[in-house]
Every structure is written in C-alpha cells, then in structure tokens.
Amino acid sequence: MRLSQSLFVTLREDPADAEIPSHKLLLRAGYIRRIGRGIYAYLPLMWRVLQKVSQIVREEMNATGAQETLLPQLQPAEIWQESGRWDTYTQAEGIMFSLRDRLDGELGLGPTHEEVITTIAKDMIRSYRQLPQHLYQIQTKFRDEIRPRFGLMRGREFIMKDGYSFHASEECLKKTYADMDQAYRNMLRRCGLQFRAVEADSGAIGGSGSQEFMILADAGEDEILYTEDEKYAANTEKAVSLPVEAIASPFNSFEKRETPNTATIESLCKFLNCSPTCVVKNVLYQVVYNNGKTVLALISIRGDQDVNEVKLQNELTKLAPNYDAKTVISLTVPDADAQQKWAAKSLPLGYISPALADDCIAKNKAVSGEFLRLVDPTAATLENFVTGADETNYHVLGANWGTEFKLPPLQVDVRLAKAGDRAVHDPTQILQTARGIEAGHIFQLGTKYSEAMGATFTDENGKEHPLVMGCYGVGVSRLAQAAVEQSYDENGIIWPVAIAPYHAVVVVPNVKSEEQMAAAEKLYADLNAAGVETILDDRNERAGVKFKDAELIGIPFRVVTGKSLKDGKVEVVRRKEGDRQDLDLDAVVATLKNWVEAAGQ
C-alpha cells in the first residue's frame, strides 16, 4: 500500500468525545471514525487489524475441530420467547434492538445466538451418534447499550466470535470447555496480549459455570480480584472471599437507645464508639419481575460489607417462580418517590431493623404484601449486634438472632468481595485488585436452552435427553482496541507484530530525491515479496510529519531511506524498543523477516 494513494488522515489533537487512550489513538491515527452514538466505521488500517485478529481466532477454533458457519442477524421473537429470554433482553437489560416487519411480526437484531443455534440443533440433531457438535461464527452483533463509551470497547455494533457446542453428557461438555479455555489462551498469547483468566458471573446467558479472559489495562471497566499464588482470580461480580474477622460487640445486654443523626454506618459507629463489624445493616431493594410484580426485598448484611447486586439479582431470579415470574427486570434502592407507590407509611430509612413490619406495605395487587427477607452469612453469625429500631434516630444494641429477631430462613451470599479480604482457598493469601477488559467469555450452559426449547437426542438405549450445551465468545473488535490500551506511549500506538496492520513502513524523507525513491521502491517490493507486509510513505510531506505519523499508527518497524544512503545504509527503527540502527541495504529484508518470525514464536 502506498500512503499517497490511500485514504489516510491523522489528527494532531485528541477528539473531544474520546475518554481513554486507546479510543483517542484509534481516532487520531485514522483507524476508526465515529458515525453515530456507539457506531463506528472500520477504516482500511483497522480492517486489516480486525482481519488478523479474526484469522488467529479462526485458526485456534478450527484446531479444536469447531466448524465455522454464519447465522442470521435478524431473529424472530418467538424463539426468544420460547427460551424465556425475550423479556430479559428487551425489558430487564433492554439491550436487544427489536422491530416489527410489514406483517407485524416481531424481530430482534441478534446480540447473541443461543436461540438460533438451539433451533438448528433441535431440527438437525437426533442421535447420540451425531454428538458432540461445535459450531462458531465471526459476525457483527448489536446491543442497545444505555451508555455507549470508549469507542469499540462498548459500542452498539461490534464484531464477535461466538461458538456453541452440543453434547450427550456433562463430561463431554467439560472436555470441550477445557479445550476452549486452552484455545482462548492461545488466541490471546498469539495476539501479543497480557491477560488473566477469571471466574465470572454467567449473567442473562446463564449456565452452571463461566470464565472470563481479561486483558489487563488500567482503563478496564471490570475489577479483578486475584491472589499472588495464582490459584484464584475472579471478576468482582462473582468473587468470593473471607471478610476480616468481626470484632466482639461491647454491648452485652439488649436495649433501645436514642442515636440522633446516625443514618449512616460511619456516623452510627462514631456515636456508639463501636466497630461496623458489630452492626447488622438492612438494605431495602425494590424488585420488579417480568410479570409486573413488585417485591420489596430486605437484605441484612454486616455493617462493614456491601451488597453485590449481581449476586443479589441472581438469587432473586431463582425466587422468581414464587411470584409466578421468570426473571428480574429491575432492581433498585427505592427513593422517596418510588416508595410513595407502595409504602403505607413513611419508612425510617437508616434506622430499619430486620423485622420491619409488613404493614409498611400498602395493599396493592401489583405489590407483594410481605417483605422478602434475606440474610448474608456475615450478619447471620453476629451476636449482641447493633441494628435499627424501626424508628428514626433510634437503634437497638445487644440484639441476637432467635431472641430479639427471627433469623431469615433465606441465608445467601450476597456480599461484595473486595481487595484486602482473605482468600477462601488459603486464608493467608490476601486478595489483590487489578483492572481488566473482558475480551472473551466461555460458559457451561448445561440444558437451560435445550430444555426450554425442546432440543433433544436419543441415547444408545433409545431414551430421549435434552442436549447439553456450551457457548464461547470472543469480542474481536474489542480485543483489537484492548491491544492498544495495553500497548502505547506518548507518541502513539505500539501494535503487537501479530496483529499490526503492516509489519513495516518505508519512509521516504524527500520524495523529490531520485536516490531515496529508488531505494524505497526496491525495499518496498523486496520486503513484501519476502512476506514482510510493508507500506510505503511516499507522500509529499515533511519528513517530521511522516515520522510522527509512523509512530502514531504504531507500525512495528520503520525503514528510512535518508542521509545514510550515501554509505549504502538505511535507518531502521523498532517501535516497541525505540532503538535505531543503520543497516546495509542488502541486510534489511533478512533482518526484518527474522524479527517478524521471532515475534510470532
């Protein structure tokens, strides 16, 4: 490629709407252009990067025996209603674009393809002899993000590899899951990225277990908790830990005490001169299920701990059948306006007890008349604790479960693990924190979709069983931007060689010099012929502009046909290392070819 003939425009200033370094650099370097909110065009340089990432992904998938396919982006609502996810994706999470066709049929633009692939399996797989099967695609996906941000990191349109496997048994699924774990590690290593595999929440996709592959970067949206012995790592949404030991309560007898202006844990503990580990705090949540039913959930947890709302939503979803519902579409801490819709009286927020009376809820068919009471293990084990008295400016001290308060029967872990907690597998290990960008996610789905949609097979005895499923996703466009977030400097992008749009750029400082142009043309031809993908900067621009652009776009190796030509040499610069050296003209091709090959090992 010759830059003089290319659509190539760089910016000297950071775009105003770009927030993180990788987003700024991809815009400035002419890789992408914003078309609308969360919608970007992939320009020629970016498309080459995406093709290289896709090819690495494709090679690793094919090596496991997976078969590439292409599934429809338009998906009928009926198959999503059959799986039970239509309300979740169009109402609760609200991330699916939905539309109606001219026949008034309801459709969705695919954010994922479990329903489509299960429909295919239902129609085509009959016998255990056809199993296992593993299909994947690399395709554009659509998600109506509430707040698209960070360029390709969280867009409304993006490129993804999604794969789906079908099995006769959990054991067979686990083998494919392990194969995918290794394949994903291979993909990320080949792309030149530093990453960490972590336990993760399965979210709306569901299943019994999942693992995320996080690219380590300060701008990552996800927090990772891990131990230095490398035996535990998890997304905070999923992480478990041992909290610090509770300090013994100084209150040995039960009493109600006036505690003015102590609606927060901090102010209460300061007033009582006690540790927050002695306090049971009670957090009220308003839960709305997909059938419109509102339930008020009262969560009791130790005073120094916070509620993990992902864990809580998962538990509330399990309880949905108790309310003739399937899923949670809203989980909020109700403000004063929200309370007016269901509260029979003003609630003493900040002073609530675990026994807040059900008559606080006004009679309303759309609202459950009883509080759903859950207790976290950190609170369930406390003795002589402090908690609210259900009266503003009053708390009770020295309270105990079984005497002053009935212990809720639902004891579930809804605690947010955090850095500084002790590890479950080894309490001497302290959880550390890092930021990460989710580039891949693998799931053991089990029979969630096959049971819901009637996708079955017959075993060797002729007995019918639901197909056991797994699914495996890689964000191709996100991975490409994450590589930039992990590798850049003050001058621009530093692409890993494996996914750089080109391996080398030949820069002609003075295009009017016949000697410089002749040497550059020969190097350009010889390098490409040797398999070193090379662009030629033959623009009629100042040398300084060309050098700045070469650094900005992040091509790994730069060859300059400058002043040293008189000695039969050219300057070669390695972008990552930043070193410069003069090489004989006849040594350039072999040297760069060796560097490219070494980077791929």
From Swiss-Prot:
EC number: 6.1.1.15
Presence of keyword Cytoplasm: yes
Keyword Transmembrane listed: no
Main location: cytoplasm
Cellular component GO terms, alphabetical: cytosol
Coiled-coil blocks: none
MF annotations from Gene Ontology: aminoacyl-tRNA deacylase activity; ATP binding; proline-tRNA ligase activity
Localization (cell): Cytoplasm
UniProt xrefs under SUPFAM superfamilies: Class II aaRS ABD-related (SSF52954), Class II aaRS and biotin synthetases (SSF55681), YbaK/ProRS associated domain (SSF55826)
InterPro entries with a match to the protein in the record: aa-tRNA-synt_IIb (IPR002314), aa-tRNA-synth_II (IPR006195), aa-tRNA-synth_II/BPL/LPL (IPR045864), Anticodon-bd (IPR004154), Anticodon-bd_dom_sf (IPR036621), Pro-tRNA-ligase_IIa (IPR002316), Pro-tRNA-synth_IIa_bac-type (IPR004500), Pro-tRNA-Synthase_IIa_type1 (IPR023717)
Subunit structure: Homodimer.
Entry's free-text remark on domains: Consists of three domains: the N-terminal catalytic domain, the editing domain and the C-terminal anticodon-binding domain.
Alphabetized HAMAP family for the sequence: Pro_tRNA_synth_type1
Name assigned to this protein: Proline--tRNA ligase
Species of origin: Picosynechococcus sp. (strain ATCC 27264 / PCC 7002 / PR-6)
Organism lineage: Bacteria, Bacillati, Cyanobacteriota, Cyanophyceae, Oscillatoriophycideae
